Amino acid sequence: MKSWIREKKYECGEYRTVGIYAVTDQEHRQRGRKHKESSRGQKARNKNASMRRYQRKVLANFDKDGFYVTGTYEDAYRPESFEDCVQDVRNYERRVKAAVIRRFGEQRARRLKLSLHAVRNGEKGKLHMHGFAECKGLTTAERREFRAMLEELWRRRVPGTGEYEPLGTCNADRIDVKKILGIDGDGKNGTVGYIYGHSERRCVETRNLTLPEELRAADVEFMHPFLPLYHDKRLTERLAEAAAGVQ
């Protein structure tokens, strides 16, 4: 069976990411109907691929002028179900959009980008929110206002009144791109890996997010027994790992 290594590159805003993985001619055959559940290893690979796609999407849409948002609940306002938490995140997205339009105008609100997740670990895990937010074109002072806005709008209306009360604590921290890339020394998968570490998660996004640009793939054929044609030591190790099925 013929095997080779495929190198795929993606333009993600100011960054370019590279994916290296093994490919066989068997993968190009016509796919039949699925008859059994994927193995645990395949599920892990699928999850890792999904995480990498989302990481590229974050890099393509958010930079150091954006914010990483975390919203938690006071016990009195904790949702009864995961779907209720998802609805709170949708309401939060809607309130942020409306507030940005009122404060900065509709034209700049079109540059508002949000990618938020309702998450929890297991049925008994605590429900909360993580995500990314950025409004392009704001001055330094306006970004401070936007940050305060993000933290204040994690709230709900008091029934029967025009007043609001906070759902819990909301923190909006400046985005650290090293954490997104997983090169800050705190876990190899970074912030996105932390979000994907939750067993349940649902994403709520604005519609104006751009997708990374996929560049033309480059294939490198391997000779038996998987000796790469590249000679760089580190790249050789990575290619050999990919050929062995290591992600």
Report the location of each language-model feature.
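Right-hand nucleic-acid polymerase module
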Residues: 1-127, 135-247
